[in-house]
Structures are given as C-alpha cells and as structure tokens.
Amino acid sequence: MMKGRSLSAEDRARLETAIGYQFAEKERLDRALTHSSARNARASNYQRLEFLGDRVLGLCVAELLFQTFLDANEGELSVRLNQLVSAESCARVADELSLHEYIRTGSDVKKITGKHMMNVRADVVESLIAAIYLDGGLEAARRFVLRHWTDRAASADGARRDAKTELQEWAHAKFGAAPRYRTDDRSGPDHDPRFTVTVEVDGIAPETGTDRSKRGAEQIAAMRLLEREGVWQKRSAGN
C-alpha cells in the first residue's frame, strides 16, 4: 500500500500493463485505488466506484454463466454466481494483480487487517472494474472480467449444488440434526454491507462465512464446513 502518495507515472504504466487496459482518463485509475482513509479522499475515494463495479461484475459474470451452462437452472446459476462474485473470489483477483501494492491509504492503514483487508482488496477490484467501464465502456469491462473469471467459472467447483441444501441433508443423515445459522456481525455502508454468519451442527465445530449478503455468508459458512469435514473436496487456491 502507498500511504498518502498518489500513483507515479511509472506505477500507473506498470499497473495498466498488468490489468490489460490503458486509461484515457488516468484519474479514474487513481480514484479506483484510493481508500477512504487517504487524506482529502472524502470526495474522491473508491466507494462510489465500488458500488457501480459490483453491478457491472455481476452482469458480466451472470452473462458468462448463462452462455456457458446452457442446461443449468436458475438455482444452480445463482449458486455459481454467488461463489464467483464473492469477496474471497474478488480478493484473489486483486492478489493476482498485486493491487495491494498500489492502494492509496491514510494514517489508519494499520487498522486494516484480517477480514477487513480481504474486503478492501475485493472492493478495489470492483472499483477498478467500474473505472474501466466508465473509461472504456461495457465491452472493455467485460474483457477484463472474462480474462479473470472465465477459468473460475469453468472450474469443477462451480458445479456443486447449493451448500446449505447439501449441509442440511448431510447433517440430518450423520447427526439427526439440522444446521443452525447465526448472524454475528453486519458492517460496511448500506450500499455495500458485509455479513458474518456462523453455522453450527451438533457434534462438530462451527464454521463462519463473510459475504455481501446474509444468504451468501450462510452459503460460504456451509461450504467451509462441508470442505472441512471432507464431504466436499476443498477448492484449489486459484478458484
């Protein structure tokens, strides 16, 4: 992270090469990488871009899934979509692009740790998608999304059924009890909330999940429990 300072021309050029897009208006890229903690960032941080980028990403991935999985029903497509646009998935894209090296932050950067740091990385990816969309249009944004999500969408992990349904059936068969979900935390602005949910099954340790929706967090918690117990094969780091 770059505390307080803006992107240099060299930094900007290197990042544009990494993301595969050259900005006509360079300030769009700067804003996409400016955390709200940065000095004088009140009117120029990435939060508004993040709001738009979330929608552009969802549209592009939904279109990709619709065109790829012709026999999938709405429920399966929704499960795939939730997995692919989750904070964890977006944060992995940020890591692949080393975006953390370019985020402009303020003096309280040390407070950004753990899950919040994952959310920051995910938010920056969404704001970057919005910046590309505003600068070059939907097709430019779609090319970026397809470059980083096509392989993820095609992975075997995407074919899994609904994690909550799977956990419900497994828990009943193994323990004779239903899973219980508890919302532990809700954070973030109204337009981009983060929910942390714990799932408990009698007889085994609980698991937690964090996502932009309560249902998404429940799905992630259920998925983690299924993976931990060996019911599902754990996802590879690239998916």
Swiss-Prot record:
Kindly list the GO molecular function terms attached to this UniProt entry.
double-stranded RNA binding; metal ion binding; ribonuclease III activity; rRNA binding
* Ranges in a coiled coil: none
The cofactor required is: Mg(2+)
Task: List positions binding Mg(2+).
Answer: E50, D123, E126
Annotated RNase III domain ranges read 12-137
- Known partners and oligomeric status: Homodimer.
The protein here is known as Ribonuclease 3
- Organism of origin: Sinorhizobium fredii (strain NBRC 101917 / NGR234)
